[in-house]
Amino acid sequence: HDTIALVGLAKDGTLAGGCSTSGLAYKMPGRVGDSPILGSGLYVDNEIGAAGATGVGENIMRFCGSFMVVEYMRQGLTPEEACAETIRRIARLDGRPIEDLHINFIALDKKGRFGAAGTGQGFPYAVTYPGYSDVLQSKALSRKHIGSEGGNDPIEDQLK
């Protein structure tokens, strides 16, 4: 996939994000992907954190994936945990094998902690801040990571 998601934290503590996509090849005329839909391809809450997505947009926007990542951070999960739990939740709700979803998330919280998770083998992502720059590999999720841990989802627990 050719989507680029960027999340950043300025020296003054302001969070920002952006995303760009080339779109799905051979798409249906008029298709709108997840990138321009706030909460799907990108979401920033300056009190909590920011998240961006890449992958099959339809599988991300049906669940407002980036918004969900930030909400999990609001509940206390680290950025990587929030990305992974979002993928697990989408997989549980969708019902298809997790590898068929082709979704990936990056996240950054207000404290400057970052993380990422993706389906299948995951994906590489870049991190840079003063004195550090590297390309890292995201957490990789497959069928064995879905589970049905009932009661471990702080968002779903609030809806009960």
Locate each region found by the language model:
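N-terminal nucleophile
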Residues: H1-K160
